[in-house]
Structure formats: C-alpha cells, structure tokens
C-alpha cells in the first residue's frame, strides 16, 4: 500500500469509472501525455500524512487526479487545465487501484472533496466527467430556447444532453450505436438519431437555421466535419471527445470564414469545476446514477474494459471495490 506524504492522503478506492480516454490508452493512440488508468475515483481516506487540510481517516471523498498551480499565466486567465503543474500532478499509482496516494499539492489545491452523506461512491465517480462537461459549457454562448447538437451518445454525450435539458435548451443527439441512441432518448434528449439523420433533424428543430452549438463528444474526425456543417451562422463547434493522435480533419476554411463558425476545444476540468459538479449531483439536478449500466470488481477490470470498449449494450462501466 502506498504511504501518505506529508500533507497528502492515501485513499481506499471504492468506485472508479472507466472513461473513453482510459479505453484510448489501452486500445488506441491516446493524444495526451499521461498513461495512468482511472481518473474518476472516489473512496475512503485510509491514512493521512500530518496536516492534510482537515481530512481524517474514514472520510468519504472524491479525488481529482490533476490540480493547477493557481499562479501562472494560464491559471490567471482561467485556463487551469493548460497549466504545466496540472499535467504533472496525479494519483499514485493510479485511480484504478485498491489504494492510491493523493499528493499534498492536490489536497492543498482542492483536489479532494468530502462527500455529503447521501452521495454514493458510484455517484461520486461521475463527478469528474460531469465537471469536464460543465467546463465545456462555460465556453458556449447558449441559453434557454437554443438548440445544441451532441455528436456521440456515450456517457459524457448524454451528460451534455442532460445539462442542456436542465437549462431549457433542446438537444439533438447522434450516435452510430442504436443502443446508445435509444438510451439518449430515454434520458430526455429532444431528438436522438443515427448520424445520417442528424443534419436533417437539426435543420428541422431549428427552422433550417442550424445548431447554436455543436458538441462533438467523440474523437471521430468524421463527426467533427459533420458538426461544422450542422452549426448555424455564428455558431460554435466544441471538440470535446479525444481524437486519436495524428487525426486530421478536412474542412472548408472559406465556409468557416463566411459563416462565422467558431471551432474550439475543451480539455478536462479544474477544481472549481469539480466542486460545481458535486454540487449538482448532491442537489439532484443531474441524475448521473442513471448512466451506470455495469459494475465490476477490481479483479474483473479486464472484463470491464472489454465491456466498456464494445459499448453495444453498455453505457457507463464502473469498477467497485
């Protein structure tokens, strides 16, 4: 078992979600530097290294794997996830372990959040992906009565749809997986269809105008190109899914220019984002538990990854211990 450094803690993992980026690390060509698995863990504090911000053994917590320095140019501009410290901090050995150490810096910078009594470990394992979604929404100028297109009906894609619904925004969702299309529809998407019907649905939902924002919640280059075509004049395309390393997209730059379509991306989440996400879950504003379809023990992690990889009949897969 790892030891708690001074100011840090060791946590016994009780639940950890499998993310699409975990699958990309195992099976694909991940485009970010860290190759550690499991960045959505929650658990119980096992040991504390001296003064650790008031944390005590036995506390139920969510733990964020990355934290920013809070003082660099990126942090000053609200770009915490681009901070050099952010990518250098992590859990050890990783979140997908019986026990993992949380560095003192993570504790000091708000990377460990005590859980309200009524929030389960499984719900807490959904804090990080929801936080990532909320951060992406902060960069979108969408309000009540608008329409977003969500390309990709995986767990975060459906979270985007749920956020839209909570704000009075229509969500047209697409996916190549019929199971996930049906899942999105059941969880409140305004429309959920296969990609070949996506553009027509968006036009129908907006009177031909196009989506105010398109969230590409998949790493598919084809989906990115499709998304640009679905955006209205002056709309925004948000790259949210992780494209494999070396991905290229062919776009008509003249069309982007003439229609004033913006393309941007959103990576990960800050400590402030995780606090907001936990607050939404605790307040019942986003029912993340409905996304969990499969649970596996840590010893069954290989089977869990295969289930999550297939996706034909699975949404969120969570490792419990």
Model-derived segments and spans:
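Glycine-rich beta-strand-centered segment in the early N-terminal region that forms part
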Residues: 2-16, 29-73, 81, 113-116
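N-terminal Rossmann-fold NAD(P) dinucleotide-binding loop
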Residues: 157-158
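Adenosine-nucleotide cofactor-binding segment
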Residues: 147-150, 163-226
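C-terminal hydrophobic helical "lid"/dimerization subdomain
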Residues: 225-229, 271-321
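NAD(P)H dinucleotide-binding glycine-rich loop of Rossmann-like/cofactor-binding domains
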Residues: 69-151
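Helix-to-beta-strand junctions that scaffold the AdoMet/dcAdoMet cofactor pocket
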Residues: 231-233
